[in-house]
Amino acid sequence: DRDGQIAASGEVANGVLDQLLDSPYFDTAPPKSLDRNQFDVSLVQSLSMEDGAATLTAFTSVSITRALPHFPEKPLRWLVTGGGRHNKFLMANLSRELGVDVEPVEAVGWNGDALEAQAFAYLAVQSRKGLPLTYPGTTGAKGPTTGGVYFSSS
């Protein structure tokens, strides 16, 4: 959805949005983690493409906003990485919902297209060295935990 044009032309299906947001995940304090399969996106399949995109965009921005009570203090600025940072409609929704500036990470000189790859490279090095990838304070794991499997192409 280039620049969020499709979502911007749709209407949020509030009933569907409420169903998506009706998850104990949002009321659970960190540490916690989430799987992409946790939500039933089939709820939007009966919607038009425009309304489905608008509803999922609203879900994204509202779900991020619902995390705010779990922060020690409200951020004064949000930096966004990943493909969503190119979606003007999503970025505007986030700014409206959060009530502060929401900018792509390029605003501070970071490469938003490389950041995820850099993070995975860091995790790969941690894994190869047998160092922790997760800690109790970040995901609720019982202790610092490494992970991953190394496969050689030779």
Which functions belong to the PLM regions below?
Residues 76-86, 117:
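Glycine-rich beta-strand-to-loop/alpha-helix junction loops that act as flexible
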Residues 87-90, 111-113:
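Short active-site-adjacent structural elements
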Residues 4, 10, 82-84, 130, ...:
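Glycine-centered flexibility sites
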